[in-house]
Curated annotation (Swiss-Prot):
Free-text function comment from the UniProt entry: Nucleotidyltransferase that catalyzes the formation of cyclic GMP-AMP (3',2'-cGAMP) from ATP and GTP and plays a key role in innate immunity. Synthesizes 3',2'-cGAMP in a two-step reaction through production of the linear intermediate pppA(2'-5')pG. Acts as a key sensor of double-stranded RNA (dsRNA), the presence of dsRNA in the cytoplasm being a danger signal that triggers the immune responses.
Keyword line: Antiviral defense, ATP-binding, GTP-binding, Immunity, Innate immunity, Magnesium, Manganese, Metal-binding, Nucleotide-binding, Nucleotidyltransferase, RNA-binding, Transferase
Species for this entry: Lucilia cuprina (Green bottle fly)
Protein name per UniProt: Cyclic GMP-AMP synthase-like receptor
Pfam families: Mab-21, Mab-21_C
Length: 368
């Protein structure tokens, strides 16, 4: 291994190494075909066709920070209820970052309108006695729609003469479809429903534009549960978009996470949250600095959050994203991050061949 002139050169090589463009097109073409087929079939359901209001690519692909084989996709499909501005949104004070959706005014309005007769019948089945939308009732309707579609497709899809098997599962708020063609080609798609709401209905933050309420279930799948997670993906995209080195460092932090077994509980959204907070504190010009300076800063921020066992949800500080993690896990992640940060700082001061190898090992599963 040739010794590089400085740490910046090493980090540039790492940044180039984690680019996945080579395989992106193969997966993307198959995924586009699956996505279009599934949505076209779902819209044959009269009720879902009425509620469906487009979709957006979410997760790492939507943010353009995917670093591994492109085999996982997140799709948020928007649900827009009739008279949606009449939905009364209130904060769930027992679960920060979550909201309740009260359909009382919606029911009163559409009950008088014949064109809403069918959707009204279904909507009443999804509400509790106080007209709050219930997470599992609504999710079971969507589940039935996906199962009907996949059954009609015989749980298979053919693209360019090659047939793949399809398997359905519920993963958190997502309706997940696993696609398998061979041992060397498989991927999954998380279809996540997002109930569209307006900026003036947001009770957790001051925002511009629409946002979504995500039907994220409780661990016990309580059928009476009526609390939805507030999601601001559009606003988050704007914050991290066109920020020079931001996405390069973001990808590298994810690659660090992926290469360390004791970091796998550091969710992608947690890493994203660190960048959202950093963007709120720094001037736009900050992201034009060298990779070396920014990545050491981000390791320090991650280290600080783990040491304090606190990472506030960007849109509601009362929610600590680390809340469900045990102290032992936090210490394991802290030790890993601290070690990486120390290596980077040493390499920034004086790069040697052993240090260079250790820097590569921070981001890649290499044996020295």
């Amino acid at each position: 291994m040739e010794l590089q002139a400085n740490l910046e050169n090493v980090l540039q090589k790492v940044n180039n190494f984690i680019n996945i463009d080579a395989k992106r097109q193969i997966y993307a073409a198959h995924f586009d075909n699956l996505k279009n087929t599934i949505f076209n079939e779902l819209r044959k359901n009269e009720v879902l066709a009425y509620l469906f209001n487009g979709f957006q690519l979410g997760g790492s692909y939507g943010d353009n920070v995917k670093v591994t084989v492109p085999n996982e996709y997140d799709l948020v499909f928007n649900i827009k209820f009739p008279e949606q501005p009449l939905i009364i949104v209130t904060a769930d004070h027992e679960l920060p970052g979550n909201v309740f959706l009260d359909f009382t005014r919606v029911i009163h309005k559409i009950a008088k309108e014949k064109q809403h007769e069918k959707i009204l019948q279904h909507l009443k089945q999804w509400l509790d006695d106080e007209n709050y939308l219930k997470v599992e009732k609504f999710q079971w309707f969507l589940r039935s729609c996906f199962i009907d579609v996949l059954t009609k497709m015989n749980f298979k899809i053919t693209f360019k003469g090659r047939t793949s098997s399809l398997r359905y599962s519920r993963e958190g708020p997502a309706h997940t479809i696993k696609v398998t063609e061979s041992l060397n080609f498989d991927y999954s798609v998380d279809f996540v429903p997002g109930i569209l709401l307006n900026a003036n209905q947001c009770v957790t933050s001051n925002i511009v534009g629409q946002w979504e309420a995500i039907p994220k279930p409780t661990p016990t799948n309580n059928h009476l549960y009526k609390s939805f997670r507030a999601s601001f993906y559009r606003q988050e995209q704007k914050i991290i978009k066109n920020q020079q080195q931001l996405k390069n460092v973001y990808r590298m932090m994810k690659k660090f996470r992926d290469s360390k077994t004791n970091m796998l509980k550091m969710k992608s959204y947690f890493i994203k949250t660190l960048f959202l907070w950093k963007s709120s504190r720094e001037n736009v010009s900050y992201w034009s600095k060298p990779l070396t300076e920014i990545i050491i800063d981000m390791f320090k921020d991650m280290e600080k959050s783990l040491r304090e066992e606190k990472l506030p949800f960007y849109w509601d500080r009362k929610l600590n994203l680390y809340d469900n993690y045990q102290p032992r896990l936090m210490r394991e992640m802290l030790n890993c991050v601290e070690s990486a940060r120390e290596t980077l700082e040493k390499a920034a001061k004086e790069l040697t061949l052993p240090l260079q190898k250790r820097v590569f090992c921070i981001f890649c599963k290499l044996k020295i």
